């Protein structure tokens, strides 16, 4: 089966969650093959490892899908300019960023 590079989608925290002073970012990693992926998160370009929870890839058709969560406080979310989900797959790196300012 040919290799397939992952597609990334990053979802911002919900308004309800922010009202509760929490912020969870979700990075959806889809349509990749083979199943081996490495996920890293960055805040303002600096690696962030605390609060990261990555689920194991699951098969969807003949490709794989996975998700990674970054749990923050609302304050941490608001105080950074950008958050990036970075995925390394078969030696290639794909990243998708999200800016809190765009998610008001």
UniProtKB/Swiss-Prot annotation:
SUPFAM superfamilies to which the protein is assigned, alphabetical: Immunoglobulin
Domain of life of the organism encoding this protein: Eukaryota
Alphabetically ordered keywords of this record: Disulfide bond, Immunoglobulin domain
One record GO biological process: immunoglobulin mediated immune response
Cellular component per GO, a single term: IgG immunoglobulin complex
Domain Ig-like: 6-99
Coiled-coil positions: none
Cysteines engaged in disulfide bonds, as pairs: 27-85
GO molecular function terms attached to this record: antigen binding
Xref: PANTHER family: IG-LIKE DOMAIN-CONTAINING PROTEIN (PTHR19944:SF98), MHC CLASS II-RELATED (PTHR19944)
Protein name: Ig lambda-2 chain C region
Organism: Rattus norvegicus (Rat)
